[in-house]
Amino acid sequence: MSERVILAYSGGLDTSVAISWIGKETGREVVAVAIDLGQGGEDMDVVRQRALDCGAVEAVVVDARDEFAENYCLPAIQSNALYMDRYPLVSALSRPLIVKHLVDAAREHKGGIVAHGCTGKGNDQVRFEVGFASLAPDLEVLAPVRDYAWTREKAIAFAEENAIPINVTKRSPFSIDQNVWGRAVETGFLEHLWNAPTKDVYDYTEDPTLNWSTPDEVIVGFDKGVPVSVDGRDVTVLQAIEELNRRAGAQGVGRLDVVEDRLVGIKSREIYEAPGAMVLITAHTELEHVTLERELGRFKRTTDQKWGELVYDGLWFSPLKTALESFVAKTQEHVSGEIRLVLHGGHIAVNGRRSQESLYDFNLATYDEGDTFDQSSAKGFVHVHGLSSSISARRDLGIK
């Protein structure tokens, strides 16, 4: 018997077509692996049945919601991960977890080939294949969408000709990827940068321009950088994300219209919805402002950016990312406390902070009675701090 192909299955157009295509073109059996990352929408049993209807000999569904939240979203929170200062890595975070479970399935189901439905223009092909090379370099990789130059039109035509059960038409060509951390929408009329997103693009968030809702004030509690409470109620990381998705999404928070630099060298436009992610990253960042020593905080902001770039670029398993996470873990030792935020009209406003680990000293900061800051020391400090600038300026101005 020829080797089985283990396919990363989303239930969408490309991977549904891939099941049938692989069977017809290679004669190999396909095992579809669908990962529940909290994406909602269709029931995973429906997704599993669709894979079987498309020709898979087996369809495996893995509930990885807590694993995704604890081992992938949490490091993103602690690294305040926003690629290009905006994108919270909605898709990028999920790929290494999918890779991990595909490799596990390949071992269990005696598959020597792993397959994905990524195009040659996107980042996901890199994330999948570098991940496979890192965890299981012995596995062969099949990428039919990329290697055989499928277009969406060709995929839709193939689906129609072969009665593949998938709800995508040429009039509604959006490509959507979603999980509990957020939702990504691309292609179609969104590829024209001047076109404004229409209402049907969004699903996780309400229209922030309506402003009919009452502002929602929420308190997020952290213990050593881990979100542990919402409004005083204990929560898991997954529960925190889910609750804040609902509450922030109802306020129109987390809508992002981004033109980003892809790893493959092109720019692309993406519409993201990440209400819970944006609230948690905002709250965590603010708590770090309160609890991290100045130089540590400054340096961590550079490592946060690098961590996000590594994950975006598909280097989740790289030695540098592993080393950076050891550093981040050290920085989180004192990141404990609560942040109060107001969610309304698409905006997040921090209006309160408290922490037993705070480095904010009221008596040093106040300008009122009780001020303990010795202002007499400031004059000498200013002179010494600016001495090198003063010396060079005198030289440049010809002042002896």
UniProtKB/Swiss-Prot annotation:
EC annotation from Swiss-Prot or TrEMBL: 6.3.4.5
Residues annotated to bind L-aspartate: T119, N123, D124
InterPro entries linked: Arginosuc_syn_C (IPR048268), Arginosuc_syn_N (IPR048267), Arginosuc_synth (IPR001518), Arginosuc_synth_CS (IPR018223), Arginosuc_synth_type_1_subfam (IPR023434), AS_cat/multimer_dom_body (IPR024074), Rossmann-like_a/b/a_fold (IPR014729)
Enzyme class: ligase
Recorded metabolic or biological pathway in which this protein acts: Amino-acid biosynthesis; L-arginine biosynthesis; L-arginine from L-ornithine and carbamoyl phosphate: step 2/3
Nucleotide-binding keyword on record: yes
Record key words, sorted: Amino-acid biosynthesis, Arginine biosynthesis, ATP-binding, Cytoplasm, Ligase, Nucleotide-binding
Biological process terms in GO annotation: argininosuccinate metabolic process; L-arginine biosynthetic process; urea cycle
Annotated residues for binding of ATP: A8, Y9, S10, G11, G12, L13, D14, T15, S16, G117
Reactions catalysed according to its record: L-citrulline + L-aspartate + ATP = 2-(N(omega)-L-arginino)succinate + AMP + diphosphate + H(+)
Residues that bind L-citrulline: Y87, N123, R127, S175, E260, Y272
Molecular-function annotations in GO: argininosuccinate synthase activity; ATP binding
Gene Ontology cellular-component terms listed: cytoplasm
Compartments it resides in: Cytoplasm
NCBIfam families, alphabetized: argG, PRK00509.1
Homology family: Belongs to the argininosuccinate synthase family. Type 1 subfamily.
Oligomeric and partner information: Homotetramer.
Name by which UniProt lists this protein: Argininosuccinate synthase
Record gene name: argG
